[in-house]
Amino acid sequence: MNKYMDLKDLQNKIEIKFENIKLLHIALTHSSYANEKKRIQYNERLEFLGDSVLQLVITEYLFMNYKDKSEGELSKKRALIVCENSLFSIAKNLELGEYIKMSKGEELTGGRERISILADAVEALIASIYLDKGIDVVREFILKNFYNIVEKAMKDEIILDYKTKLQEIIQKDGDIQINYILIKHEGPPHRRKFYTEVKIKDNVLGYGIGYSKKESEQNAAKKAIENMEVNKEYE
């Protein structure tokens, strides 16, 4: 039996028994599976809610436990903690990829290891716990699973994500607005590719491609940093 058919193992792993098991099934259903089966709910709406719940819990924790840090410092730390890479690492620790329902095509192209799919599933899982058990239980789940990430971030042991790093480089010269613009997207809903450019006014700094908007923006920022480093070498 595939693990997504029996979620008792996952419930034991996260030490949470769901009252409404349907919420957990939806949280672990990728859009590609829903497209194949029709009339099946998938996890994008839960992902939307889970992102906000995660932001709230981490923000509250940092606010209450790091009273010596300024708003700006806390915002930077939160950006390090609540990012796609962190969510991916949580998903890997929970072996979440084994439980996700997805299309055969998605699975054959590496969907169970894809960063964006796993990160989104963690956010959806957080939302499902929140809806089923409330804020206290989901807070405990988040702080338990993100504890090491929070500790490393506060000890400056996590490398900045590319968007944050680019922002810090650019804003050394003042409060300059950086814009991420989605140029286009292509492909079926379960395998959509996003193209993003990062600009300052009319100056394009870099382009990025990814299987989520977040991933394409991070790759655009990474390319912008690389381009800036190359230009420095030839100045």
Swiss-Prot record:
The keyword Magnesium applies. This is Ribonuclease 3. Digests double-stranded RNA. Involved in the processing of primary rRNA transcript to yield the immediate precursors to the large and small rRNAs (23S and 16S). Processes some mRNAs, and tRNAs when they are encoded in the rRNA operon. Processes pre-crRNA and tracrRNA of type II CRISPR loci if present in the organism. Its cofactor is Mg(2+). It catalyses: Endonucleolytic cleavage to 5'-phosphomonoester. Belongs to the ribonuclease III family. The keyword Magnesium applies. Mg(2+) binds at E47, D120, E123. GO terms for molecular function: double-stranded RNA binding; metal ion binding; ribonuclease III activity; rRNA binding. SUPFAM superfamilies: dsRNA-binding domain-like, RNase III domain-like. Residues 161-230 form the DRBM domain. Its EC number is 3.1.26.3. One of its GO terms (cellular component) is cytoplasm. Pfam families: dsrm (PF00035), Ribonucleas_3_3 (PF14622). Its main location: cytoplasm. The active site is at D51, E123. It is found in: Cytoplasm. Residues 7-134 form the RNase III domain. SMART domains: DSRM (SM00358), RIBOc (SM00535). It comes from Clostridium tetani (strain Massachusetts / E88). InterPro entries: dsRBD_dom, RNase_III, RNase_III_dom, RNase_III_sf. One of its GO terms (biological process) is regulation of gene expression. CDD domains: DSRM_RNAse_III_family, RIBOc. Keywords: Cytoplasm, Endonuclease, Hydrolase, Magnesium, Metal-binding, mRNA processing, Nuclease, RNA-binding, rRNA processing, rRNA-binding, tRNA processing. Homodimer.
